[in-house]
UniProtKB/Swiss-Prot annotation:
UniProt PTM comment: Disulfide bonds.
Membrane-spanning intervals of the chain: none
An individual GO BP term: killing of cells of another organism
Organism superkingdom: Eukaryota
Keyword set includes RNA-binding: no
UniProt entry keywords in alphabetical sequence: Antibiotic, Antimicrobial, Disulfide bond, Fungicide
Tissue: Expressed in flowers but not in leaves, seeds or roots (at protein level).
Protein name from the UniProt record: Antimicrobial peptide 1
Annotated organism of origin: Taraxacum officinale
């Protein structure tokens, strides 16, 4: 599964990337339910 990073408050967090739109989900549970190719 592709990953992406997003900056928040000067800190970097890793989120799921939902293909093919590569949207960063801030909610980890949402990542788990939406990521393709887990």
């Amino acid at each position: 599964v592709a990953k992406c990073t997003e900056e928040s408050g000067g800190k970097y967090f890793v989120f799921c990337c939902y293909k093919p739109t590569r949207i960063c989900y801030m909610n980890e549970q949402k990542c788990e339910s939406t990521c393709i190719g887990k």
